[in-house]
Amino acid sequence: NSSIRQRIIAQFHEWMTGAGLLYLKSAMPQVGCVFTTHATVLGRCVAGNNLPLYSEMKNYVPEELARRFNVISKQSLEKTAAHQADCFTTVSEITATECAHFLDKEVDLVTPNGFENVFTPSEAEWEGKRKAGREKFLQVAQAILGRPVAEDALILGISGRYEFKNKGIDVFIDAMGQLNRNNGLGKE
């Protein structure tokens, strides 16, 4: 029971939300739909396979790439969502170039990735937040290992989308292996 006067906007991020956008466009056309991509399906495939993305982009034929990497459905849904959205956005100028080529659609707006300063604690709060965060990490490590962990243990975390090469998880694991083998830090 919504009307055009209510000015409702729905935000959809990445290809996997595309079906929701398409459904809402059909069921409630009075709702404005924004589709945002942080990288394209094909861009992730190219980069994840150690192929040159931006220097060779103009030579890639999107349909051929989608077939090659077996992502035809994902790429099709992403492209359709981008074209059907009332507003299509991405997070950087370079990704806008990727969208124009792989999705055949210019973005309407670039909404830069990042955090506002209000998300970062003040200098006065920083040390307390760091200590509280470290304590939580130690509790998690002890729960996972089922044993006490030294207070000065080296605790590292990594987060983000699971893209082994694109996000550097392979490099992170290799670096952790080197630290483990060398134990030059003299810490657990």
Language-model features: locations:
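Catalytic cores of nucleotide-sugar-dependent glycosyltransferases that transfer UDP/GDP/TDP-activated
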Residues: 1-188
